[in-house]
Amino acid sequence: MHVPQAEQLGQAITSLRPRQIGAIPLVYPILADLGVRQITNDLVPTEADIDMGRIVLLLTLNRLLAPQPLYHVQDWLAETVLPQVLDIAPEKAYDNRLGRALDRLYPHLGELWARLASQAIQVYDLDLNVLHWDITSIYFEGAYTDSELAAYGYSRDHRPDTKQVNLEVDVTHDGYVPILYHTLPGNTADITRPLPHLSRPRC
């Protein structure tokens, strides 16, 4: 862990107010090594009091450690050491603000992922000679009538009553770090993907 990160976490932990620490000291340094905040801010600059990089860090940590809807992130944040670590007051992390941030981030997701993957390859000296590929699915509650991706299909979650989106992922052999991903309509058959997918890692 870098010294500034350790000092930030240490100051938060010594607070007299009880707060959740959990796996933050393990996960936060990895996000810092990957340069999540700086890469995000380079792609989506803002003059707001909370930069996009910190919002992405907050939402990433929430998704990894305690996944919940946007309207609960504010309450979760208040119970953790992250207000001190990220310098984000809980009252400023309301759901509409987080939603607008995600809308701004969406057009840049491909470039953001590419830069983060490149950073991970360099920082952790990942071996790309062998990649493992697989398809999974994520199901959604609701109609999603205007979605081009959400569709009924083979449900790996045993939820044939819900629409889903398929996700194909390539991970490294050493550590199973995700390097490439591609979203697919939920009714895509696995058997149709190997040949088209072979061209993607070479691009």
Task: List the model feature ranges, each with a label.
Residues 191-203:
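Short, basic/hydrophobic alpha-helical segments
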Residues 1-151, 161, 168-187, 195:
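Dynamic "connector" segments at or just before major functional cores
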